[in-house]
Regions:
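Conserved long alpha-helical elements within nucleotide-processing catalytic cores of c-di-GMP signaling
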Residues: 1-12, 18-45, 56-60, 73-80, ...
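Regulatory/sensor and coupling segments of signal-transduction and defense proteins
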Residues: 130, 134, 138
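Short catalytic/binding micro-motifs of nucleotide second-messenger systems
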Residues: 45-51, 83-98, 132
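A short glycine-enriched loop-to-beta-strand structural element that forms part of the catalytic core
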Residues: 11, 56-62, 66, 92-128, ...
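A generic structural signal for alpha-helix starts
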Residues: 30, 70-73, 114-117
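Residue-level recognition of strand-loop junctions within catalytic nucleotide-signaling folds
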Residues: 25, 66-70, 87, 109-112
Length: 144
């Protein structure tokens, strides 16, 4: 609420590792934990500024990114640029060192797309867009 009171809008993105269950089955818990930490650190490089940008882990493989003063289109463009430059492999150092390939799907939305300060509706819209990105094959940003 502070963001929407102090800024023109706020945007939210949900970011999830694609095929996480398959990765877990193939790689095991220890490698998966290392992969999730690697991914989290990649996003934290860009979105760990509490006054205007924040990233947090919601579940084992799901992250939320929030930005003040960005529309959905602006956040989506920024996310696409960052994701395009992000490594798509993590060097797992558990057991024998090996590269673990991964992709991510992202769904984002803006407070301007929902009525009032309805955070539940904003989250639901992000979930729908994340599902659309995954349904379309993953490895992409869906912004509506």
């Amino acid at each position: 609420d502070d963001w929407t009171d102090a800024h023109r809008c706020a945007s939210l993105a949900l970011v999830e590792l694609d095929k996480a269950d398959e990765l877990l089955a193939q790689q095991g818990d220890a490698v998966m934990n290392q992969l999730v930490c690697f991914v989290a650190n990649q996003w934290k490089k860009h979105y760990d500024r509490p006054d205007e940008r924040v990233v947090c882990r919601l579940t084992d493989t799901l992250f939320a990114i929030g930005c003040a003063d960005k529309t959905c289109a602006e956040l989506a463009e920024e996310l696409r640029g960052i994701y395009a430059e992000m490594p798509r492999e993590c060097v797992a150092s558990v057991g024998l060192m090996r590269r673990v390939a991964f992709t991510q799907s992202i769904g984002c939305a803006c407070t301007g797309e929902v009525r009032g300060k309805n955070w539940d509706a904003l989250y639901k819209l992000c979930e729908e867009r994340l599902a659309a990105a995954k349904t379309a094959g993953g490895d992409q940003v869906c912004a509506g």
